[in-house]
Amino acid sequence: MKYLLKTQLPLLLLIGMVINGQQSQEGHLLLSQLEIENTDQPWWPATKNKAITNAPIKIAGNPYKHGIGTLSGSRLFFFLDGRSSDFKCHVGIQDKQDPAENVQFNVLSDGSKLFYTQQQGEKTFVGIANTKNNIGKGSVRFIIKGDGKTLWKSKKITGGQKPQPVKIDLSGIQVLELSVEDNGDGISGDHAIWAQPTVTYTSFKPQLVDANYLNKLKTVDKNFTNKIKPLVQELPMGQGEYVQGTKADWLVNDINLPSKVYQQANGKEIVISNGLVSRTFRLTPNCATVGFTNLTTAETLLRGVGPEATITLDGDEYVVGGLDGQIEYGYMKEEWLEQMWSPPNSFQLSNFTVGTIKKRINWPNKRWSSQPKGPIKGKHIGFDYTHPKYPDLAVTVHYEIYDGIPLISKWITLKNNGQKAVVLNSFKSEILAMVEAESAVEKQKGWETPNIHVESDYAFHSMSMKNANKVVHWEKDPRYTSQASYLLSTPCLLECKLPIGPNKTLDANGTFQSFRVWEMPFDSHDKQRKALYTNAMYAKIAPWVTENPLFLHLTTTDDDKVKAAIDQCAETGYEMVILSFGSGLNMEDLSKSNIEKFKALADYAHSKGIELGGYSLLSSRWISEEVDVINPETGKRGGVIHGSSPCLNSQWGIDYFEKLRTFFSKTGFDLLEHDGSYPGQLCASTSHIGHKGLEDSQWKSWKRITDFYKWCNENGISLNIPDWYYLSGSTKNGIGYREVNWSLPRERQLVLGRQNMYDGTYDRLPSMSWTFVPLTEYHGGGAAATIEPLDTHLGAYKAHMIQNYGMGLQACYRGPRLYDTEKTKATVIEVVAWYKKYRDILNSPIIHLKRANGREIDGIMHINPALQEKGLALFFNPTNKTLTQTINLPLYYTGHSKKVQISEKDKEKVEYELARDYLVELEVQIPPNDSTWFVIY
């Protein structure tokens, strides 16, 4: 059955009803076309276009093709939405039939019998009486009500009486009720007929609803009128740049426009906007996103309405908010919203709150970074939802919009305020019917997706965002039947959902917070401009990634050598020593001697103004059968990502993180270099203490490791992790290189290193990555590959430092020392001093000018219109001859539009006029295998 009123539809169904057809603008509806047979009435279901006895409809000899066959005691309810004009029908009692053959019966509580026949499993009603031969002729009264008030009531109607015509005005009626009452002489023979029951409607097609629907409407209307609407009215009206968008380019100009939540003139919608992006929510008959606009281009991103989220509880899926009834999913018109209803069985909006953005992670910002201390500015709005089946479960959908950047964040939370446990099997925290990026008729090998950046903090098992982004999916939208694709395969439905689980049990007072997603529409397809968007996003939502301490990768834990390295760092301007892999550091050793050893070294480093960090390996380890991840395919350990790995939710895994917390707390270490971080593997074990089984293993593991990373971040512990954990507190990731390349000859390392940095600084800030310099042998290569002795290979050593620091990256200078002679020391001091002088601009986003190819000048340019140094361009000559070239330097993103001053290597400034395309012609001459740099003021 599609619709069974006897099962009590969830309260707050609202205007939702299960239908198959689409709305019509105007027409006449025979109510018998609806799912009448699935309604609830005493003794036997109503019948469509037949009498209750399944015979053709006939009243006093008058046949009718259409009608509803019922019994006395029946009540039928139809939602009209106040947009029907009249109701017409004929009423009467079905003519008596000859006694049926092979009649069976059930005895009723009053001693009478319900007679029926049965053929091939199908039962047919005959009547109610003491015997099958004395079924009465029937005697009833028909009643028509509108919104609970009687509109018409018949006199006594008996069997054999001619049909009575009825015509009722329905103007303004929300719910129409058709009922039949017994006339006091019993139900026998009360085979009532609503013949040709026709409603004339405009714009909204009547729908079958349940008996409590009117009360539901009143409840919803009351909640909107008494609670939601007053909250809306407290908000300001939208105007100016919040509605039309700001005209300035936010990548060049500081947008001093605080985010705002405002109301629409219709009183039913509210908008979050910062002048760059906006999202519109309609709050009645349920809450739904009905607008998503890129205000920088005035582009509408949304083509359809859907739920705000879906959640599967105890095995059943429920929609959260949303609207149904859109007649076309290729586009959306505002007037259609008035004709839409809340989805059946949905969580209903009960309240909303507006506030400011709260920090996700309380980053202490204790070392150098390009981001100032202070709060992240913007607005937060939370929409609260309830459901009658889960009266103690609070569901909230959260949004944040950030000042000065076209960026919105979203996540959901659940709280169980009752005593009965609830299982959250799965969820979708975002569902958006977006305008497609391309319209292709045939099957595509690769589809272009909408031009919007969507990223989540639920990320792992990759050093790039594209591969680490595990929850963002562009799906087909089967509702979009008018799309160009014959197979309806256009990926234009954004869904954010877990690969599996979380299968989270919410006990009494239990809570759940989903992953977050961030959504940022681009205004261009230009790769460089889109890169500047994401650079700005990371600085805004994960400001800790702008930390960029200068560090030495030390390969020993010998006290004297560590102290000597610390001394060298202090003398040259370096800021941190990292006890690297292979150094002998074991953070899992909490013995008194181990803690005392490394606390003493940390104390010594701090006394010199140097920080101390170290390496720990998590994944790609074989621990034991009881501890390791169980492969779901084999039921045994092994054969998973990294070969074998400990399950983070085994007792060993839980103890591992506690050991690291203890080590850092007792030693005062400042950085964790965490190798083999959690790669998202599933664990099929049912004996690990921290998870129930396969379905919750990934979520629990991700939660455990990201909770640890957040703890580190909040305690001032910097995090170097070769994985995409930035949004969970990590500060650095590898730039993306092939490790064996560091065993190649030095001159090849330099060119390949610049290629790696050039490619790896599009989607992220320079400070977000590390690169590598093998001071000592690494993966082979011998003397031709290493920098040691440093003085002997000082040219290569300096070249590495210039290109790394010049591009804003720290490198893992892996070896026992920073210098071996006074000459080497002076060179290190010179480069570090240069870096620190221009540190702000060198840590700013990069404009990619020319990728290194080993044959000609290559280079990049940092830009930051907020600084005194608006840009710094760095060029390299990889050849054995002097190269001279006129370079068109693009200065648009420096903020200059007319004139600019440029200085080469701190020489006298030269003034240039910008061309109409913001270019200046710069004459560049570079000696063989050397570099030069220019500062733009």
Annotate the PLM regions.
Residues E913-Y937:
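C-terminal beta-strand-rich structural cap/linker in extracellular carbohydrate-active enzymes
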Residues I228, V320, G325-D628, I654, ...:
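Conserved structural scaffold segments of CAZyme catalytic domains across common CAZy folds
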Residues Q23-K216:
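Gly-Asp-aromatic-enriched flexible segments
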Residues T219-V243, G267-S369:
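Acidic-aromatic substrate-binding/catalytic surfaces of carbohydrate-active enzymes
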Residues I270-G275, R279, N286, F292, ...:
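Active-site-proximal substrate-binding groove within the catalytic cores of carbohydrate-active enzymes
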Residues F598-D603, S607, E611-F669, Y678, ...:
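Active-site-adjacent "subsite" loops/lids of carbohydrate-active enzymes
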Residues M1-S24:
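Bacterial Sec-dependent N-terminal signal peptides
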Residues E575-G582, F657-G690:
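Active-site groove signature of glycoside hydrolases
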